[in-house]
Amino acid sequence: ECATLEDVDYLIDAANHYFPNNMISRDDVISTWAGLRPLIQPEADMGDMAESQVSREHQIHIGEDGLVTIAGGKLTTYRKMAKECVDTAVQILKLMGQLPEDLVSGQTYKNPLPGAIGWPEDDDHEAVAKQISEECECEMSDATRLHLVDTYGMRALELSRICAGDPSALEPIVPGRIEIMAQVDFGVREEFAASVADILVRRTQIFFRDEDQGLTAAHAVADRMAPLLGWSDEDRQRSIEAYEAEVALSRRWREEL
């Protein structure tokens, strides 16, 4: 799936309607993406019903063989969906006698997200950045410290320790941008990044923010990832080419101009 020229123009028109002082044009578009929303087909005939009227709610179905299936829903309700799905599976396993009756239901709503443990109650980002400066001896700029804090919360301390042990980790992923190579290391070691696209699209969002979409950095990122993942030269090249293809797909709408 990829965005079309019609999609791009629709979003530009919507943005300019709500923010008329900005007057965005096609030239301002760096990247695009498209996907399918997993809506549940209404039981009744949709008739003239617009897609926007279809329910975004999720449903859980239990098959005759005990398979628990969840469908529909939204990204913003991911935790609630996961909890309800797991709780349903737990109840089934209890009925089958495979789990103790006193097993409690999920408590994920009480668990802080990664990086939130130890976060100051007054939400003072600069205090955490100062803590990094005091605890880790590395030549890191104030802007980089704040970037790491804004991105990783308290886990920014872990990235600063990577930099303290390896000065090359402070090098920018893309010259002139704020993201650093330590984020590549951290992405592989702690966030299951397994490809150049994982880093540039899904961990740093350079794909969406850099005018070149990080194409010039793809080789350096692959070089950084290769020893961490045990890549061969072929693996490295394959990951670079896959990223280049993803960038090309995000720009395909321009072929319609």
Which residue stretches match the model-derived regions?
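C-terminal accessory subdomains/tails of enzymes that are appended
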Residues: 2-257
